[in-house]
């Protein structure tokens, strides 16, 4: 089983940071939207993997990561991935960069409707925003 880790960054408006993946047939989920994340490397714990992926893809260094969920999903090649998802609040100080994909931006939850998203990501974004409202 492959392990993945990701971070849903929520801003003060309740928007979530999403990446528009490149439209290349050689990658998984081309031309889809997703939150920052990727594979967990050998000898790396899930939180460290999530932090690394977030920084690599956006340049953003999160202060606190809160665990959101661990669950399985199927990739386009039918491989099962165990994803370890965290969430954090955007500090409004650091610039968000697009170091991977074609675009990186905060989207309102309503804007996720009609977009091609990775499996289960809309539900997880809603869940992260609900958790953020409790802080």
Show the residue positions of the predicted features.
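Conserved N-terminal beta-strand and adjoining loop/helix that marks the start
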Residues: 1-17, 36
């Amino acid at each position: 089983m492959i392990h993945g880790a990701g971070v849903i960054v929520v801003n003060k408006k309740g928007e979530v940071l999403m990446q528009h993946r490149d439209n290349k047939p050689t990658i998984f989920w081309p031309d889809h939207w997703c939150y920052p994340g990727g594979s967990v490397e050998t000898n790396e714990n899930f939180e460290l993997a999530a932090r690394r992926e977030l920084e690599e893809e956006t340049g953003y260094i999160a202060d606190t990561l809160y665990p959101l969920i661990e669950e399985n999903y199927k990739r386009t090649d039918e491989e099962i991935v165990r994803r370890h998802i965290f969430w954090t609040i955007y500090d409004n100080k650091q610039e968000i960069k697009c170091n991977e994909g074609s675009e990186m931006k905060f989207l309102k939850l309503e804007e996720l409707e009609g977009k091609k998203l990775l499996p289960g990501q809309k539900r997880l974004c809603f869940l992260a925003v609900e958790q953020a409202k409790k802080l």
